[in-house]
From Swiss-Prot:
GO terms for cellular component: apoplast. The keyword Secreted applies. The keyword Metal-binding applies. Belongs to the germin family. This is Germin-like protein 2. It is found in: Secreted, Extracellular space, Apoplast. The lineage of its organism: Eukaryota, Viridiplantae, Streptophyta, Embryophyta, Tracheophyta. May play a role in plant defense. Probably has no oxalate oxidase activity even if the active site is conserved. Keywords: Apoplast, Manganese, Metal-binding, Secreted. It comes from the Eukaryota. One of its GO terms (molecular function) is metal ion binding. Oligomer (believed to be a pentamer but probably hexamer).
């Protein structure tokens, strides 16, 4: 369930 969270976090970090 981290893959989905990472996708959102990366969007903000990016």
């Amino acid at each position: 369930a981290f893959q989905l969270d990472t996708n959102l976090v990366e969007s903000l970090q990016k």
